[in-house]
Curated annotation (Swiss-Prot):
Group of enzyme by EC: lyase
Record's GO cellular component terms: cytoplasm
HAMAP family: HisB
Protein name: Imidazoleglycerol-phosphate dehydratase
Gene3D superfamilies assigned to the protein according to its UniProt record, in alphabetical order: Imidazole glycerol phosphate dehydratase, domain 1
Primary location group: cytoplasm
Length: 190
């Protein structure tokens, strides 16, 4: 279990992460839709995740969403790196009704995000553009490469949830144990 605390003038965050968990979550960011996405992420990655965020949500949800991504990404990095005896690569296509989103990841120690999901507007009171902000913050602090790409879909909620679940399942698959892998790189280091 990794625990990280981060305080700024905009947010006060505590994250606990166990990547060898069972999908249990205790999420409280004060942003209902975001909590729902993080609960789905934890469940389908099989991570045990606790997130408590007190943020300036009276101003905007942006700081809370981005900062949770930063801290959760840092906790993931500390939990996983250096990568050893893991598959390293993972992918998933997740469908939710009319929506389908694909995610491919590499536990590369080279942060890069390709995000091609066409979600404009809001989901309830949640600005859909914040989904990309979360993924960018998570990916760059987790130091992974992730491609999250919409295959089809229109419903904002479905596209968002399929995106979080696709990342979760791809991470679970990349973290699958393979004792033959050793250091899964021809360079000998990630």
């Amino acid at each position: 279990m990794i625990k990280i605390e981060r305080q700024t003038k905009e947010t006060d965050i505590v994250v606990e992460l166990n990547v060898d968990g069972k999908g249990k979550s205790d999420i409280d960011t004060g942003i209902g839709f975001f909590d729902h996405m993080l609960e789905s992420f934890a469940k389908h990655a099989r991570f045990d995740v606790k997130v408590v965020c007190k943020g300036d949500i009276h101003v905007d949800f942006h700081h809370s969403v981005e900062d949770v991504g930063i801290v959760l990404g840092q906790a993931f990095y500390q939990s996983v790196f250096p990568v050893h005896n893991k598959e390293r690569f993972g992918d998933a296509v997740i469908v939710m009704d009319e929506s389908a989103v694909e995610c491919a990841i590499d536990l590369s120690n080279r942060p890069f995000l390709v995000y091609e999901v066409d979600i404009d507007g809001t989901i309830g009171q949640f600005d859909a553009e914040l989904i990309e902000e979360f993924f960018r913050a998570f990916v760059f602090n987790a130091r992974i490469t992730a491609h999250i790409i919409q295959k089809r879909g229109k419903n904002r909620h479905h596209l968002a949830e399929a995106s979080f679940k696709a990342l979760a399942v791809a991470l679970r698959r990349a973290l699958a144990e393979d004792k033959r892998a050793g250091m899964p790189s021809t360079k000998g280091v990630l």
